[in-house]
């Protein structure tokens, strides 16, 4: 959906989706007998176990659906990723609770009784990995060796996908324009400042508080000064108790928030559609690079092949076709490995 002491390290993880090359001929390298074997898709740990990429795609298409959770379209370009996956492989993508937190993703795995709605995969902050113990399926994507050891579980139960830098974003109608976090304690911002979620449940909000602590002379390890700052903003009426996201911004519920830079980019595009303008800056009093969000497969995924194909897709994009480039019937004409190669740009 963390290791707090590492938040200030500048991990070199791409801010959208890790872009690693996927070998287009992957399926053809598998033994001819592999595809003929009966496969338990819930325990498949690699494309080789699946009998090759063509076999994995075929089974995923047979399942026909993929259940995502907490993946809003304006977050890390998920909208385009979902559209491309659905169109390329003709798999229906269901997105539940798009604005949910990492903690809520784990709760959904633990408590969802209706298997049709059970999440197949999760995108969670490292801060909740302990809560996910025993819930995730080991699976190593084809590009496993290219993922830094520091951002993956050795057994393949999770792997870092993308990370961002903490930004301060705001409606351009705000005056004066904020340039640092401590600027937010200004009477001009009454009723304007929001956090991007609950810091006890959402990694983005947690690190926003850490950044605020740093800006006020504290540290990421001890966020007391960050908490005190937001208490002060609440007392003077600047802080509003709404989630700092695109939908609440559109209603005018707030005008200033902290959040990942890649989300600020997405919010900027969304705001333009409703006639508003957003700008973002990296606050001069807190330069904070986040550790990655990790992707993982639910051990009890109702669509286990589709879940594994999604992970292969997410770790394989380069500069190939996206949704607008794909013909509606491409998936009927092209086998799985070749389709993946087209998405990659091969």
What are these regions (language model features)?
Residues 1-63:
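Short, low-complexity disordered leader/linker segments with a strong preference
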Residues 50-61, 71-92:
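Short, polar/charged alpha-helical segment
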Residues 67-83, 94-110, 116-253:
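Extracytoplasmic ligand-binding site segments that recognize negatively charged/polar headgroups
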Residues 126, 197, 261-262, 326:
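Short secondary-structure boundary segments
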Residues 127-133, 250, 255-276:
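A ligand-binding cleft/hinge motif common to bilobed small-molecule-binding domains
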Residues 136-145, 156-160, 185, 269-289, ...:
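Short beta-strand->loop
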Residues 164-167, 210, 278, 291-295:
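Small-molecule pocket liners
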Residues 288-289, 293-346:
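Mature extracytoplasmic/periplasmic domains
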């Amino acid at each position: 959906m963390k290791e707090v002491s590492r938040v200030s390290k500048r991990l070199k993880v791409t801010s959208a989706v890790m872009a690693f090359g996927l070998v287009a001929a992957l399926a053809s390298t598998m033994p001819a007998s592999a595809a003929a074997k009966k496969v338990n898709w819930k325990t498949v740990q690699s494309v080789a176990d699946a009998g090759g990429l063509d076999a994995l795609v075929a089974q995923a298409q047979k399942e026909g659906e993929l259940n995502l959770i907490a993946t809003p379209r304006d977050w890390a370009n998920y909208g385009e990723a979902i559209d491309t996956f659905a169109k390329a492989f003709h798999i229906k993508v269901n997105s539940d609770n798009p604005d949910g937190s990492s903690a809520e993703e784990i709760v959904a795995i633990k408590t969802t009784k209706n298997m049709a709605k059970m999440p197949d995969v999760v995108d969670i902050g490292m801060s909740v990995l302990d809560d996910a113990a025993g819930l995730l399926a080991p699976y190593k994507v084809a590009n496993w060796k290219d993922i830094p050891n520091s951002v993956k579980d050795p057994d393949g139960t999770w792997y870092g996908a993308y990370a961002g830098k903490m930004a301060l974003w705001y409606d351009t109608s705000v005056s004066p324009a904020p340039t640092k976090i401590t600027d937010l304690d200004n009477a001009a911002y009454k009723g304007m400042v929001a956090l991007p979620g609950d810091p006890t449940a959402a990694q983005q909000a947690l690190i926003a508080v850490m950044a605020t602590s740093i800006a006020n002379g504290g540290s990421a390890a001890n966020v007391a000064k960050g908490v005190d700052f937001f208490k002060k903003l609440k007392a003077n009426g600047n802080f509003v108790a709404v989630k700092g996201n695109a939908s609440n911004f559109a209603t005018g519920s707030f005008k200033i928030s902290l959040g990942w830079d890649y989300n600020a980019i997405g919010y900027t595009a969304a705001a333009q559609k409703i006639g508003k303008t957003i700008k973002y800056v990296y606050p001069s009093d807190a330069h904070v690079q986040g550790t990655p969000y990790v992707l993982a497969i639910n051990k009890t995924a109702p669509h286990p092949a589709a879940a594994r194909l999604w992970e292969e897709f997410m770790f394989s994009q380069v500069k190939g076709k996206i949704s607008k480039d794909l013909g509606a019937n491409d998936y009927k004409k092209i086998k799985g490995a070749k389709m993946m190669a087209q998405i990659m740009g091969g």
